[in-house]
Amino acid sequence: PGRLWELTSSGVGYLQDLKGLHFFVLDEVDRMVEAGHYKELGHVIELLQQPEAPEDDTQEEELPPPIQRQTFLFSATLMLPQMARELNAKRLKQHKPLREGSTMDTLMKAITFLNPIKVVDFSRKELVATKLEQAKLSCLPAEKDAQLFLLLQQRKGRAIIFCNAISAVSRLRSLLTLLEVNVLTLQGGMQQRARLKALERFRNTPHCALLATDVAARGLDVEGVDYVVHYQLPRSAEVYVHRSGRTARAAAAGLAVALIEPADLKSYRRLCHELKEASGLPDLKLPLQQLPRVKEIVSLARQIDKTSHVQQRAKEKETWHKQMVKDMDLPSSDEELGDDEGMSGRNRRAEQQKLAKLGQQKKELAQMLRRWREDPEAPRNSKRF
């Protein structure tokens, strides 16, 4: 849409009036409402709209006969048939303008359909690959990270872990790195070069977890993805299908696991309804007898991660303050300087104590991880643990 709008804006004569077109085709129509397409697509649709007859019948101006245009929409979205039924029921003939923040629903309303909408559905009865195994892990919010870590330890290979937000990707990257998991990230805030580099490393690493937002849900073809984890439940069934489609490709087997919190139950039931999974997804079997030990390990890793972030922010603030004083060339008396040096000394001692404690916690975490991997079935309160 952006390229076409650029051409129409350049003054090319035969592109100034598109009202005479007999065919209008939108491919991957569900992607047309993603960020970056709203404005240009709205302009193109406006160029296609035919003038409406005036309300005043006495007006002498005659309008040209309307063009019998056929409109084709191609989409993988599961909601398209339902939207078509609703539009046919309402028989909306006056289009609504497409604005920023538009959804698939408003796009359908923005296009003028002169005749009833017909839907041709080529989708299979199964919406996901036939060799894709689907499962769920029911967990409390406090146990979610521990169950994810246990899953990653039980199932080796390449895994893609999907999150709904970049902040969740960043948090999990720090946590899983402390837990000695080989992790990479792929999210919308990364430059294209960094994304390609991450994908290349992921392809070349046999045992690795790729933390990703939905930027990786479409168009990502990586051979040998063993399983997909929906760490946060996707916002729609379409996204779930696209995410899960990163594994079980080209007739290969694969696994998609959804982590379900109590707050997700409503969305989960809606997802199962749209996937035609009346009885819900089966539970994934994990050695939950190991969960108490894993929770203690993950809890310690969280403490280390939180302390590290606090210290990093304090260090950045101190560096910024020193740079500001230096740039402004602020004078200070000997007394103030002495006070600053005394305070700085106390701060350094406190900082050294925190660093020593942090180092001790990291050693303790490494020992807990080693002992757990050597004997995962040992009880939580044993001396070996």
PLM feature spans:
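Conserved helicase ATPase core of P-loop NTP-dependent helicases/translocases
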Residues: Q147, R158, S167-A217
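Arginine-glycine-biased low-complexity disordered regions
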Residues: Q50, Q59-Q68, M83-L87, L92, ...
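Conserved RecA-like ASCE ATPase "motif II neighborhood" in helicase/translocase motors
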Residues: P1-D17
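Conserved Walker B
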Residues: E28-M32, V169, V215-A216, L233, ...
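A short beta-strand-to-loop transition that corresponds to the Sensor-1 phosphate-sensing loop
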Residues: P1-R3, E28, L73-L78, S123, ...
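Post-DEXD/H (motif II) to motif III coupling segment of the RecA-like Helicase ATP-binding lobe
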Residues: G13-L26, D30-D121
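Conserved interdomain hinge at the start of the Helicase C-terminal
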Residues: E126-L178
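SF2 helicase motor core recognition
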Residues: R173, P206, L210-V228, H242-A252
